[in-house]
Amino acid sequence: TVIDTDDELIAYLKNKLQRFVFLDEHVALPIKVEYGTPKTLGKDRLAAVVGANYLRPGKNLLVIDAGTAITYEVIEAPGIFLGGNISPGMTTRFRALNHFTKKLPLVTEEDDIPLIGRSTETAIQAGVVNGIVYEMDGYIDELKVKYPDLLVFLTGGHSFYFERRLKNSIFADINLVLTGLNRILEYNVED
């Protein structure tokens, strides 16, 4: 997530704390970042990448974070963050269909999603959910062509909803961002 920071608060914390690590584009990281615009890179995306690389070092990795947006982050062995893709998340897609059309209702996900919708509501659910599943599996399949040994992490608020729907093997880790934040902190305070 990219947010504005309170410079006054940061100055106060730096003054009051013995050690203060602020996650920005200048912080030391245990991975190499080849992302073209590090200043605009979401801190959650960066932390998830660091977390995945910490859990499976030296591997080719794809991190899928399924939340408000769905992000796809590629880490090439031995720990090079190449970049990724961003698409609308499930709730965002449901809301967009409702907001940008005149008559489509706002629906939410259900446990049982048909392949073919039999009503407007189930057609929206099937379109959104199955579309995301095909998108995720599509990215995984394409990356496995280049990286046959690819390991995939799935995290984010909707990760458990999608983990059982994907045809590809994945590691679901709801705490991947927190793992990455902790690793960044450790990396910056090691003596």
Task: Give short role names for the model-derived ranges.
Residues 70-75:
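Short beta-strand scaffold segments in enzyme catalytic cores
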Residues 1-61, 78-191:
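Nucleotide/phosphate-binding catalytic cleft detector across ATP-hydrolyzing
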